[in-house]
């Protein structure tokens, strides 16, 4: 099935905008800019939403404004209201277990400790598509909170942006429902040396 809803997970507020935890927001924000999709607050879905054409496909965008650990309060109502099947849903989020500059497309699986996914999966299951944007791990779990809530170093940010660009290039495949080709293209991305 083709992707009909693209969600970017993050935390609302200017103080969080450029933190690693907002990598999902960066993805959706860039899509909205690139394809001239107006984003506006939507109280019904506790988020910022938009709808428009991306590579000829009608797509909805969502950035929850509920803070990361309450993402389900935004995503679940929108999925249910519009009758979005899980295989039509793509959730972009930061991923500690992948180095900055890497990006992976995954379907199914657990929440992997990600609080945004942890709040969504009990309500809709786990068989949706995830765009896992690598932000790297700080080395010890006691440093995770500070890591995700801080800005990436300039070289890391360049690497993350390059990985996001690789996902943008695979978007036509995702929107056409060719998930396996998209997965191969995205997961095969390597930073230039």
From Swiss-Prot:
Site positions for Discriminates between blocked and unblocked aminoacyl-tRNA, renumbered to this chain? Answer: 11
Which domain of life does the protein's organism represent? Bacteria
Per UniProt, which keywords does this protein have? Cytoplasm, Hydrolase, RNA-binding, tRNA-binding
One of its GO biological process terms is:
rescue of stalled ribosome
Give one Pfam family, short name only.
Pept_tRNA_hydro
Catalysed reactions, semicolon-separated: an N-acyl-L-alpha-aminoacyl-tRNA + H2O = an N-acyl-L-amino acid + a tRNA + H(+)
GO MF: peptidyl-tRNA hydrolase activity; tRNA binding
Q: Which GO terms describe its cellular component?
A: cytoplasm
Entry EC no(s): 3.1.1.29
Quote the PROSITE patterns the UniProt record gives: PEPT_TRNA_HYDROL_2
Explain the purpose of this protein.
Hydrolyzes ribosome-free peptidyl-tRNAs (with 1 or more amino acids incorporated), which drop off the ribosome during protein synthesis, or as a result of ribosome stalling.
Q: Can you tell me which family this protein belongs to?
A: Belongs to the PTH family.
HAMAP family, per the entry = Pept_tRNA_hydro_bact
Q: What is this protein called?
A: Peptidyl-tRNA hydrolase
Q: Which species?
A: Psychrobacter arcticus (strain DSM 17307 / VKM B-2377 / 273-4)
